[in-house]
């Protein structure tokens, strides 16, 4: 199967969803050789990945992931970025996740170790005292009881090990860089998703439209962040399902919400421990650019989760989540519960 897919891609043809799904299954089961994997992702990168291809790869990846089953009736959201923007900001999406949870929206955060910064979400959560090595049942309990849970990508996508050596050796961005945020093990249907590669922002939005998303905001800022930025306008592709799926493009300016524009250098992070201190300071109410960028991203996430009707309303909900102590409380709850569950070794 992988051989026929390769022939088609090399000939310049576009894979449909089923073909891409079968190709990913061949990779996930170890059927595809390293040479075939490298040839496929390189050819796709040179030609440019299409939405049907990425959607099929996501479906193939989901079929081999370890799922997290949530027993919640309300919307559950993920706040995540592709990484790889090279700006080395602190972990904005991680801080944002606690604010969103503090505003009453459950968060099932999917993440990994460092990519574009010196510390990924997994590294920073560890530095904050959260256990990241939880099994599916334990993660579900965290989301349901603490309002937020974390799924460590390496644990929930073990089949990706077949592609890992190729990714390391190639050393350039491939389709795998965008798959993780699209393959949340809890199958969330609401997302704030940052994309580092400007050429893929609209494509990723249209991938979500082909999948089972209900409401998502896909973002990329003009200063290169895979977040909503304080330093430049942010392009937003909004995907909403209401009978039919609509994809709408708009631009977000921080000034429109009364936030001061500051360069992304003001959001620079450091080690996992340094970033953890920044995240905790934001949750404790410290003022400044770090707080403002988290408020801005949390406002967008609350809109994506249908918890706010506008960014202005989302901003007020986010402010209240921090200033009331609710966001910090979610961190403390997750810290206590994740450690207790890890020690108890809740069965999968």
Curated annotation (Swiss-Prot):
Catalytic activity: N-(5-phospho-beta-D-ribosyl)anthranilate + diphosphate = 5-phospho-alpha-D-ribose 1-diphosphate + anthranilate
Keywords: Amino-acid biosynthesis, Aromatic amino acid biosynthesis, Glycosyltransferase, Magnesium, Metal-binding, Transferase, Tryptophan biosynthesis
Enzyme class: transferase
Functional pathway: Amino-acid biosynthesis; L-tryptophan biosynthesis; L-tryptophan from chorismate: step 2/5
Binding site for anthranilate 2: 167
Taxonomic superkingdom: Bacteria
Pfam families per the UniProt record, alphabetical: Glycos_trans_3N (PF02885), Glycos_transf_3 (PF00591)
UniProt binding sites for anthranilate 1: 81, 112
InterPro entries given in the database record: Anthranilate_Pribosyl_Tfrase, Glycosyl_Trfase_fam3, Glycosyl_Trfase_fam3_N_dom, Glycosyl_Trfase_fam3_N_dom_sf, Nuc_phospho_transferase
Binding residues for 5-phospho-alpha-D-ribose 1-diphosphate: 81, 84-85, 89, 91-94, 109-117, 121
Cofactor: Mg(2+)
GO-annotated molecular function: anthranilate phosphoribosyltransferase activity; magnesium ion binding
Family affiliation: Belongs to the anthranilate phosphoribosyltransferase family.
NCBIfam families in alphabetical order: trpD
Function: Catalyzes the transfer of the phosphoribosyl group of 5-phosphorylribose-1-pyrophosphate (PRPP) to anthranilate to yield N-(5'-phosphoribosyl)-anthranilate (PRA).
UniProt subunit comment: Homodimer.
Descriptive protein name: Anthranilate phosphoribosyltransferase
Source species of the chain: Thermomicrobium roseum (strain ATCC 27502 / DSM 5159 / P-2)
